[in-house]
């Protein structure tokens, strides 16, 4: 193959920035829905193709997703993404967006996943509750290579970024964001949309099922995760939790080193690989116990780990945005989400108004037939249309009265008239209820329902 000359200046001016922008969008999660492109494609495929509770083989889903959403990087990569999304052990996802078969997606003791031909996944019930079907029409879908694919982002009622966290390394940027306590995030959102400009909340990282504590270290200016250790006597300790980010297998290797260099005498590994319960019994000397108290004990036994964060996210324009605090990310999310609540409200009112117009026209049409103002028996279609046109309050739909002319004969009765009357009343009440409800109250109501299942 002949060498091709390429203008270096042109490469750095056009090709490299284009690649970097695409790479960033792939590898860094959005602050709006907490998803990377591949994750969003998987969720969209499940929503459209397999919305039920029945699980589908991971391998099958990956292949269907690659074709359905025009994924450019192969089904094998999507299998790995599914594995990450389905992991639900402590330190992985707090609330996995995919519901996988137990044990197939790793544990705290061994986070390796089974082969994708053996594992199965489905949408988690939590994820379904994070989305509102009325938002789908508002967000719209992207158009790629002649096909409609997934939206640029979902608009969940809760920032999924802080439900499970996110990490990624791309061209020139990286992302490391830990999950937060959903109750605290909901409280922050409620305060913010109720008018509190800067809610004073610490919002420390939170890991579901983790027994240790997370504290902010002012000297290091970062959060730290602690394990749990109990002193039994002067020569014995029991460890019942490890810091976030330290795997059981790696910790055993570290304990072996402590034994080899004489720091500790011995240890017993009593961890339960079935339940992920952590339990190590440590044997030490009296001298060790005297010299190791407080933080020094935690540091020596690797029971404290820093949780540094890099607050880079993809924004609504698929560009990297660097934030300075968790609160700043939340504020940006709230601004976007409120925008879409306004759009949802407008969409609902418009949809209900259109439905009301149709029901009212049907009511007037049926009433006219019952009252014999309009006669349809032995009449040509054009004659019926002319009679309808004399009723100014009966509206056309898509430029014609076809929706009325197609009504079944049993709908042209006094009973149907009463039914339509009830439907109109119900729709008017729904319209009035939505109209008088503020978008802030709509969101608060959604969060109230979500909190019941978190």
Located regions from the model:
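Catalytic phosphate-handling regions of large nucleic-acid enzymes and associated NTPases
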Residues: 1-222, 281
């Amino acid at each position: 193959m002949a060498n091709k000359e390429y203008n270096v200046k042109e490469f750095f001016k056009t090709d490299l920035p284009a690649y970097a922008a695409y790479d960033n969008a792939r590898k860094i999660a959005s602050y709006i829905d907490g998803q990377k492109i591949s994750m969003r494609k998987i969720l969209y495929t499940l929503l459209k193709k397999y919305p039920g509770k029945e699980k589908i083989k991971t391998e099958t889903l990956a292949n269907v997703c690659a074709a359905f959403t025009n994924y450019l990087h192969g089904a094998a990569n999507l299998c790995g993404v599914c594995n990450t999304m389905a992991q639900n052990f402590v330190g992985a996802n707090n609330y996995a967006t995919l519901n996988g078969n137990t044990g197939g997606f790793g544990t705290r003791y061994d986070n390796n996943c089974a082969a994708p031909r053996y594992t199965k996944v489905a949408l988690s019930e939590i994820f379904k509750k994070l989305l509102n079907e009325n938002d789908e029409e508002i967000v719209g879908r992207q158009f790629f290579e002649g096909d409609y694919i997934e939206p640029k982002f979902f608009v969940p009622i809760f920032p999924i970024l802080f439900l499970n966290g996110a990490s990624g390394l791309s061209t020139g940027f990286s992302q490391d964001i830990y999950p937060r306590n959903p109750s605290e995030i909901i409280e922050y959102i409620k305060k913010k949309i109720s008018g509190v400009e800067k809610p004073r909340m610490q919002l420390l990282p939170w890991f579901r099922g983790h027994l240790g504590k997370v504290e902010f270290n002012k000297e290091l200016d970062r959060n730290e995760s602690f394990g749990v250790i109990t002193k039994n006597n002067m020569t014995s300790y029991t460890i019942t939790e490890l810091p976030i980010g330290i795997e059981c297998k790696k910790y055993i290797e570290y304990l072996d080193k402590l034994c080899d260099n004489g720091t500790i005498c011995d240890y017993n590994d009593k961890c339960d690989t079935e339940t992920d319960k952590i339990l190590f019994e440590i044997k030490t000397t009296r001298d060790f116990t005297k010299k190791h108290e407080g933080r020094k004990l935690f540091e020596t036994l690797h029971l404290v780990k820093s949780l540094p964060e890099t607050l880079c996210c993809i924004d609504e324009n698929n560009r990297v945005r660097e934030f300075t605090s968790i609160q700043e990310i939340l504020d940006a999310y709230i601004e976007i989400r409120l925008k879409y609540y306004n759009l949802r409200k407008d969409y609902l009112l418009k949809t209900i108004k259109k439905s009301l117009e149709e029901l009212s026209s049907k009511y007037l049409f049926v009433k006219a037939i019952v009252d014999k103002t309009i006669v349809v028996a032995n009449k040509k279609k054009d004659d019926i249309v002319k009679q309808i046109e004399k009723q100014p309050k009966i509206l056309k739909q898509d430029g014609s009265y076809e929706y009325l002319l197609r009504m079944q004969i049993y709908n042209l009765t006094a009973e149907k008239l009463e039914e339509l009357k009830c439907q109109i009343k119900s729709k008017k009440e729904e319209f009035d209820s939505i109209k008088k409800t503020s978008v802030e109250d709509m969101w608060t109501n959604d969060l109230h329902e979500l909190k019941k299942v978190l």
